[in-house]
Amino acid sequence: MLAFGMLGDQARAETDSAHAVAVVHTDYVAQVSILTHLAEIMRRQRTGKIVVFSSVAGVRVRRANYVYGSAKAGLDGFASGLGDALHGSGVQLMLVRPGFVIGKMTEGMSPAPMSSTPSQVADAVVRGLNSGATRVWVPRILQPVFFVMRLLPQTIWRRMPR
């Protein structure tokens, strides 16, 4: 299970390239490195399950958190491709796309609509692993919501609140 990351400070990242790079390195580059090594080990074993935590922030990147969102978009794409590459190898990759999770990373922030708790995310992961799912949205309602969000014209999307 690959579960680490940083939200970072969007305002700071817009003027401090080192901070922006730190967010992207943590949320994308470091995860790609670990996933590549892990996948190779598990391919040789011909068995295993990999759980990767992306985010709905990467499904359609928003102005409010585009540094974090772009890193998660990259991770989401990498994990999707890796999951396809592992197909038939005995190794399963499950991509988890949580929405706003009330926890340490979001401490001090107002919860977004359809927020979840770490225990709700954990329960969804267990259900996904038990069912053989390749994608898990937490909460589930976010899947159809983001299907629609991807269809919105950029002029409307740009004005969307957090």
Where are the regions a protein language model picked out?
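Rossmann-fold scaffold of SDR-type NAD(P)-dependent oxidoreductases
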Residues: 1-5, 52, 94
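C-terminal helical subdomain
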Residues: 95-96, 110-147
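Residue(s) in the substrate-gating loop at a strand-loop-helix junction
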Residues: 55
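Alpha-helical segment proximal to the catalytic Tyr-Lys
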Residues: 40, 84-88
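Conserved mid-core segment of classical short-chain dehydrogenase/reductases
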Residues: 5-21, 64
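Active-site helix of classical SDR
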Residues: 35, 71
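Active-site loop immediately N-terminal to the catalytic Tyr-X3-Lys motif
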Residues: 60-66
